[in-house]
């Protein structure tokens, strides 16, 4: 995602981006059915559910509502596609990579359409959907396409007359449950490495945001993937999500979402067939600003770090620790940034903040804002909803926040910036680590020794130094503690989608 340091999520910073097209406001939704075996199906139950535009609260369309029988049908298709001798299994690794490249080409071709669908369904600014979400999808697909024919085992030295080596083989049918904050991007983070390694998939998009996943199904067929390799079942967590998590013929599941639901997914996986689990869960991420930091950079990065995507990021800079010498100035500048942040119509290219995803999330954020006021934090700006029919909340900044306040402990997932004060490095390390989460952290300092000390001491899967949200397809991403298990992206993701097999051969005793 774009930040003040020039990094782009899942990409290289030196690539010239395409021109921003005119957004398509009233896009016709073509794909609303369940995608199994490269065909479109109605749900077994005949039920449908509505997906709505959070900017207007108006219904976009109705989507087929999957349930356990639909998941069973999808798993059966994925099993058949994975059988030895199937068209998918007969493909060599280079051809698998070529298919992923073809899918990336199609996503790039339809980039404006996918970005418009994402904006309609999530309320995120079209500017961000086009340049960040879709850019990340394309780069992730191309990155793992390149890995397809480079997954290798090792030769292991043993005794004389014995040859021992390892093979990295696909797991089989993999499930994926994706969130509503980055619907297509989080799907691609799972799909690309799984297909690169030769697996088949059953996917459940978030019920709030199913449209880009279903559109991708049409591109998967167009790219030439054999039937059954990718299957997409829209529906709800307690039905489709539970069926995928507990299905005895699904061998691995990847989930991105809340820690609460992640626990349920892992429990269901263990109680069924001990399927392998990758979890990318919540975060209460510390952003540490030292007195010697470049304050302009720190203020801008912390601002983007918490307000990007309406604050609906697992990586959000939701605890900003500022050294006391620069605390007042940091707060002053942060308030200036927040007051100037453009909030409104996500199809307006000047907009940087759209609505929250739904009424439930909207109400939760406002309740946490009220808790901050009641518990003694100083409201510097914002603190209420916008006067609009959509689910918009004013960018909110709190100062004089203490560690025991709810806004400093709970994942807000909204446009709220709590700013805390610290006196020493040892103090801020202890306070930053005093959470059940451990997804990301950031440090702003000009002192290399201090930066490396903090990077080593912070209990987080990712630590950014003098930047924020600098995510790349090449670099692994995942959490410590209750922020999850396993890693997505980078070479490390390949291990999540392969089984290691040891082959040992006893040679004859006779000399040649």
Swiss-Prot record:
Pathway: Cofactor metabolism; retinol metabolism. This is Retinaldehyde dehydrogenase 3. It is found in: Cytoplasm. The record marks 181 as: Transition state stabilizer. It comes from Homo sapiens (Human). The active site is at 280 (proton acceptor), 314 (nucleophile). NAD(+) binds at residues 204, 207, 257-262, 361, 411. Catalyzes the NAD-dependent oxidation of aldehyde substrates, such as all-trans-retinal and all-trans-13,14-dihydroretinal, to their corresponding carboxylic acids, all-trans-retinoate and all-trans-13,14-dihydroretinoate, respectively. High specificity for all-trans-retinal as substrate, can also accept acetaldehyde as substrate in vitro but with lower affinity. Required for the biosynthesis of normal levels of retinoate in the embryonic ocular and nasal regions; a critical lipid in the embryonic development of the eye and the nasal region. One of its GO terms (molecular function) is retinal dehydrogenase activity. Residues 1-22 are annotated as: Disordered. PANTHER family: ALDEHYDE DEHYDROGENASE-RELATED. Expressed at low levels in many tissues and at higher levels in salivary gland, stomach, and kidney. Homotetramer. The keyword Oxidoreductase applies. Its EC number is 1.2.1.36. Transmembrane segments: none annotated. Keywords: Acetylation, Cytoplasm, Disease variant, Lipid metabolism, Microphthalmia, NAD, Oxidoreductase. Belongs to the aldehyde dehydrogenase family. The keyword rRNA-binding does not apply. GO terms for cellular component: cytoplasm; cytosol; extracellular exosome.
């Amino acid at each position: 995602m774009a930040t003040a340091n020039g990094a782009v999520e899942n990409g290289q910073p030196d690539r010239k981006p395409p021109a921003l097209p005119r957004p398509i406001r009233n896009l016709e939704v073509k794909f609303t059915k369940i995608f199994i075996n490269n065909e479109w199906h109605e749900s077994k139950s005949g039920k449908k559910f509505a997906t709505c535009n959070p900017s207007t609260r108006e219904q976009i369309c109705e989507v087929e509502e999957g349930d356990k029988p639909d998941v069973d049908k999808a798993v059966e298709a994925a099993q058949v596609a994975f059988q030895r001798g199937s068209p998918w299994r007969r493909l060599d690794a280079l051809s698998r990579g070529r298919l992923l490249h073809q899918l990336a080409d199609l996503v790039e071709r339809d980039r404006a359409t996918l970005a418009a669908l994402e904006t309609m369904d999530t309320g995120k600014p079209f500017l961000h959907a086009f340049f960040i979400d879709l850019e990340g999808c394309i780069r992730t697909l191309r990155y793992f396409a390149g890995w397809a024919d480079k997954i290798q085992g090792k030769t292991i030295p043993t005794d004389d007359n014995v040859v021992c080596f390892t093979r990295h083989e696909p797991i089989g049918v993999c499930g994926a449950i994706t969130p509503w904050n980055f619907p297509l991007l989080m799907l691609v983070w799972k799909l690309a490495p799984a297909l690169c390694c030769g697996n088949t998939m059953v996917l459940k998009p978030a019920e709030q945001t199913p449209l880009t996943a279903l559109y991708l199904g049409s591109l998967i067929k167009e790219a030439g993937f054999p039937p059954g390799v990718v299957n997409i079942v829209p529906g709800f967590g307690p039905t489709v999500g539970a069926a995928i998590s507990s299905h005895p013929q699904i061998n691995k599941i990847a989930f991105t979402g809340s820690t609460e639901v992640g626990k349920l997914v892992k429990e269901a996986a263990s109680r069924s067939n001990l399927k392998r689990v990758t979890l990318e869960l919540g975060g209460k991420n510390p952003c540490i600003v030292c007195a010697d930091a470049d304050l302009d950079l720190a203020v801008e990065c912390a601002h983007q770090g918490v307000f990007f995507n309406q604050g609906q990021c697992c990586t959000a800079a939701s605890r900003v620790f500022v050294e006391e010498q620069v605390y007042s100035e940091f707060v002053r500048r942060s308030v200036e940034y927040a007051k100037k942040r453009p909030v409104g119509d996500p199809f307006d290219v000047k907009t940087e903040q759209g609505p929250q995803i739904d009424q439930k999330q909207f109400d939760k954020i406002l309740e946490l804002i009220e808790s901050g006021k009641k518990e003694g934090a100083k409201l510097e700006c914002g603190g209420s909803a916008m006067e609009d029919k959509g689910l918009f909340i004013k960018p909110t900044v709190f100062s004089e926040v203490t560690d025991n306040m709810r806004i400093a402990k709970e994942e807000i997932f909204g446009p709220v910036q709590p700013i805390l004060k610290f006196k020493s490095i040892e103090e801020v390390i202890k306070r930053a680590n005093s959470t059940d989460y451990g997804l990301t952290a950031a440090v702003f300092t000009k002192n290399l020794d201090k930066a490396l000390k903090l990077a080593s001491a912070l209990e987080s899967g990712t630590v950014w130094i003098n930047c924020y949200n600098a995510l790349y397809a090449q670099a692994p991403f995942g959490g410590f503690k209750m922020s999850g298990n396993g890693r997505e992206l980078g070479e490390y993701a390949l291990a999540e989608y392969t089984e290691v097999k040891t082959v040992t051969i006893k040679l004859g005793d006779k000399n040649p």
